[in-house]
């Protein structure tokens, strides 16, 4: 994907939680939110970091997912996705969801270094200008629920961490420019530390302040040691929308987007704006209203 006029803009949606058909009035509000934000922002890339829909107890979840993909596709803006813990809970698998995405989305960004590990897809989207890579977007499927009894949520697998280490090292330019951004659904455990250094936004999640896995497989350590990673943007916690910093790495929550999802923090999205010269990454939250 190419920079335009020295900039590249991403709009990140997360936790839209579309449910059963016919659509609930809250789902209609979420579609309207998507319309307003994409019309106002006109991004170069749309990112969705999971919990695109509820799948548990949802009849015809394949149709629900296809309708949502068709809704995004009408904008003819490239769409990149990863999945959350609710997308493939019941009746559908991640591979089936990827097939629907592939068949439905007509404007897909070019993925590189694609690897699927235990049905979890991981890939990179380079952002370029005149053939030169300027920034790298890493998409990691952070899984669903912990199946081993060590906590509530799954963790990024060691094999995925190794894929990230190898791929990010290959993309290094050795100029100390932090040009890599990771998108995934579930936060890494280091968010517990970084929430003590919030740059903007709120931390209002009450069940657990940070709904991270109990097992730490070293993804953050590899981000830090690489030296050229700006940070990570996740979803999952609907009442957290903060950007924070730990050891110079940004750990941020995107603003929750779906009106079917719990939480009193106003629904919206997060904008990531990347400037080439001088190189800079800025993020900001958009909130549509103060209602759930």
What spans do the regions from the language model cover?
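Acidic/histidine-rich helix-loop elements
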Residues: 14-31, 53-63, 89, 147-155, ...
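Active-site environment of divalent metal-dependent phosphoester hydrolases
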Residues: 19-22, 54-57, 81-93, 145-148, ...
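Metal-dependent catalytic neighborhoods of phosphoester/phosphodiester hydrolases
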Residues: 21-26, 50-70, 88-110, 194, ...
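Extended active-site neighborhood of metal-dependent phosphoesterases/phosphodiesterases
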Residues: 2, 64-176, 270-275
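Active-site-proximal beta-strand elements of phosphoester/diester hydrolases
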Residues: 7-20, 134-144, 183, 250-256
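His/acidic metal-ligating clusters that form di-metal
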Residues: 41-45, 136-138, 151-241
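N-terminal active-site segment of His-dependent metallophosphoesterases
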Residues: 1-69, 73
């Amino acid at each position: 994907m190419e920079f335009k006029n020295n900039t590249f803009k991403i709009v990140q949606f997360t936790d839209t939680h579309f449910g059963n058909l016919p659509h609930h009035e809250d789902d209609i509000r979420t579609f309207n939110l998507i319309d307003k934000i994409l019309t106002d922002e006109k991004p170069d890339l749309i990112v969705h970091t999971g919990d695109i829909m509820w799948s548990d107890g949802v009849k015809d979840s394949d149709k629900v997912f296809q309708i949502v993909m068709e809704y995004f596709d009408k904008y003819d803006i490239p769409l990149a996705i990863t999945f959350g813990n609710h997308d493939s809970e019941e009746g559908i698998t991640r591979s089936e969801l990827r097939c629907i995405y592939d068949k439905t989305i007509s404007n897909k960004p070019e993925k590189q270094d694609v690897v699927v590990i235990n049905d979890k897809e991981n890939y990179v989207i380079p952002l370029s200008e005149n053939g030169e890579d300027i920034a790298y977007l890493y998409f990691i499927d952070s899984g669903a629920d912990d199946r081993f009894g060590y906590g509530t949520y799954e963790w990024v697998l060691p094999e995925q961490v190794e894929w990230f280490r190898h791929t990010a090292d290959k993309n290094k330019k050795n100029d100390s420019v932090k040009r890599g951004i990771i998108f995934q659904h579930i936060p890494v455990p280091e968010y517990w530390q970084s929430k003590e250094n919030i740059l903007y936004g709120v931390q209002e999640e009450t069940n657990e302040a940070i709904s991270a896995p109990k097992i730490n497989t070293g993804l953050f350590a590899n981000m830090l040691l690489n030296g050229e990673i700006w940070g990570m943007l996740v979803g999952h916690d609907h009442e957290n929308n903060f950007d924070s910093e730990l050891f110079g790495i940004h750990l941020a929550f995107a603003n929750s987007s779906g009106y079917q999802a719990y939480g009193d923090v106003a629904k919206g999205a997060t904008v990531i704006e990347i400037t080439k010269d001088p190189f800079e990454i800025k993020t900001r939250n958009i909130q549509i209203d103060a209602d759930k």
